[in-house]
Regions:
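A short glycine-rich beta-turn/N-cap micro-motif
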Residues: 1-6, 15-25, 33-41, 49-58, ...
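Glycine-centered tight beta-turn/hairpin loop motif at sheet-sheet or coil-to-beta transitions
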Residues: 7-9, 26-28, 42-44, 60-62, ...
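A motif-centric feature for acidic-aromatic and gly/ser/thr-rich catalytic loops and repeats
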Residues: 10-17, 113, 126-201, 208, ...
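A short acidic/small-residue loop/turn micro-motif
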Residues: 10-12, 29-31, 46-47, 62-64, ...
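Short, surface-exposed charged micro-motifs
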Residues: 11-13, 30-32, 46-48, 64-68, ...
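Polybasic, low-complexity binding patches
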Residues: 245-255
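Membrane-active amphipathic alpha-helices enriched in small hydrophobic residues
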Residues: 255-274, 285-311
Length: 311
């Protein structure tokens, strides 16, 4: 067909003086900032910051989402709606999480436990629920998690995104709220469904507007001083979300395309997406190929051990 009209569906207003990279409003929703460039209002939602640039709280209409971090800046806890999620790491790699309802917050051994296994490239390829039920990740060619398949070769969770990573559709037939328990979504980033933000380590990304919530940390700015001059310090992946990714919120890189020979499950995932769900048989091939390698990884350094601890 022929392009006849351009539909304008988003409106941004920027500062005309001072820090001109800062948005003042998006579709009528206000932004305000502190002296360090952290938004205290993000699309009309109040944010609370601590220790300079750590996001501590998001105040939504139904309640708050609170975050806690360790001394290295890794997020170790999220509390939302009475539920507390505690994150565990093997070095800088997320090895697992434990989610507890409010009534079980102080009780050891009670909660939902999730462990993760990674492939040789550092990509999540298996999720183990409560130490006994395994699910395998499906990917598209750009490395986005498009779903999870169970050990019976059934696709039980599906995700869809727009080009900026906003989750546009979620289907969950797992019966255990797996789509909510799984943190990895677009580009394998850790997703917070309560806020719609992605936690990229050093800062958060907002796919609704296609920008980071706040600017790079001082270390990144100093290291990349020549490269960042004249750049918008809030922009995500140089405004190229299809071909680039930013794993830690520091500096983007070109996306490594998924090759059939490097991950069987990724190939099955891409075909599952392209065939609108008829790739279940291909997912079965992926599961069969992975089961043998997963058995040896559980309990080892790839997963780490999740234990109750006092933070």
């Amino acid at each position: 067909g022929t392009l006849q009209t351009i539909k304008k569906n988003e409106t941004f207003t920027y500062r005309s003086d001072g820090w001109k990279d800062q948005i003042l409003s998006w579709n009528g929703y206000r932004y305000t900032y502190d002296a360090g460039g952290n938004p205290t209002l993000l699309r009309g939602v109040p944010l609370t910051w601590g220790e300079g640039r750590r996001l501590n709280k998001v105040s939504l209409s139904w309640g708050t989402v609170d975050f806690a971090y360790d001394s290295d800046g890794k997020r170790v806890r999220k509390t939302s709606g009475g539920n507390t999620t505690t994150y565990y790491y093997n070095g800088n790699v997320l090895s697992g999480l434990v989610r507890k309802a409010a009534q079980n917050a102080g009780t050891a051994g009670i909660g939902t436990t999730v462990q993760f296994v990674y492939d040789a490239q550092g990509k999540p390829f298996m999720l183990r629920l409560n130490g006994k039920t395994d699910y395998f990740y499906l990917y598209n060619g750009l490395g986005d998690v498009t779903g999870l398949v169970d050990s019976s070769n059934q696709v039980v969770v599906r995700y869809q995104y727009n080009s900026w990573g906003k989750v546009t559709s979620t289907q969950d037939n797992s019966g255990v709220s797996l789509a909510t328990l799984n943190p990895f979504c677009y580009r394998k980033y850790v997703y917070d469904p309560e806020t719609g933000l992605y936690c990229l380590g050093s800062r958060y990304y907002d796919p609704e507007v296609g920008r980071f919530v706040n600017v790079d940390d001082f270390e990144t700015l100093t290291y990349q001083l020549d490269s960042v001059q004249g750049k918008n310090l809030y922009q995500y992946c140089f405004n190229n979300p299809v071909n680039m990714e930013d794993e830690d919120g520091g500096w983007p890189k070109w996306v490594t395309q998924v090759l059939v020979g490097t991950a069987v499950i990724a190939a099955a995932a891409a075909l599952t997406v392209e065939t609108a769900g008829t790739g279940t048989a291909l997912a079965a091939v992926a599961v069969g190929a992975l089961k043998g390698s997963v058995i040896g990884a559980i309990g080892g350094t790839a997963v780490g051990k999740i234990q109750e601890q006092q933070l």
